[in-house]
Every structure is written in structure tokens, then in C-alpha cells.
Amino acid sequence: MQPLMGFFIAALRYEITGELDVWTKMLVIVKTSMLNGCAYCIGHNTTLGRALGMTDEQTHALEGDYRNSDLFSAADKAAIAWAECLTERHYHRDKTTMADLKEHFNDTQVLEITMVSGFFNFWNRFNDAMELDIVNRFKKSTELDPEDYVAYMRSCWWNAEDTMDGYQAKAAE
């Protein structure tokens, strides 16, 4: 099961490119994880966010009043607000959040933002229910060089003998 879950996580973060940039995906992942209170996901994803350039100030703003922060663009704020809306399940009552999102993102990007937040709502609950130990993976991610982000993500989920490159090579045959 780990390779399958790893595939989904890597795909939603980076491996399978869509129209949505990795920065926006990471903002959505971190905000969703914060709202769900999943210690494993918060620790791991804020560290990965740092590797992408997320500052401590931005992390704190995500926890607090990001809407009035000058640390995020209007598009960032719209994506964060939509993740919040999905996680807190008030999207049926809040049509303005979707309208704001569509001012900054096309339909494909809106779909990607929704998929990322939706998946991490599941993943946060799964990790909380399984009471995963954060120590080993978190320790590994704190030593992450931003240049090695993709290599790190691959190393988290596939066995050494069955790397993503190996899967890609087999698929090309």
C-alpha cells in the first residue's frame, strides 16, 4: 500500500505536472494539515515548504490571519481560503470563495487545488488515526536541500530497487 499512497502524494505535490505550480500546492497542503491538526503532516509539510522557500513568517501567517498578510499574493490567499472552505466544509454556503478562486485560477487549476486539499483532508485523518511516528521522516526532511526536493519525495515512497525511475524505465519498454 505504501507505494500506491506514495504515488498519490508525490503526484499531488510534484511528480505529475498539471497547470498548478508546486508553491500553490504546498500552501494548500500546509493549510489543510493545520486545520486538521495532524502533527505528522504539519511537521513534515512545513519542512518541505521551507525547502520550497516558505518562511517561518509565512508559516505563522497560515496559522493566523493570512487574509490580511502581505506575505501572500491575492492568488495565494484565494487558494488558501478555498482549502479552508473545503476543510471546514462550508463550501455550499460560501459562494464568494469559489468566485474569488476563479478570478485567479482557470478551471483545471481549481480542480487541482480541490484535489490536493481533498486528498490531504483524507491523508491527515488517515495519519492521525494510525498515530504515525513523526520522528524518523521528520528528521530526514529537516536535512533536505531544496535542490534535492524531487529526489527526496521519490525516496520517501519507493523501495531502493523499485525507484520511480525504475517504474518509468519499465513503462518505456
Language-model region placement:
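Hydrophobic alpha-helical segments
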Residues: 1-173
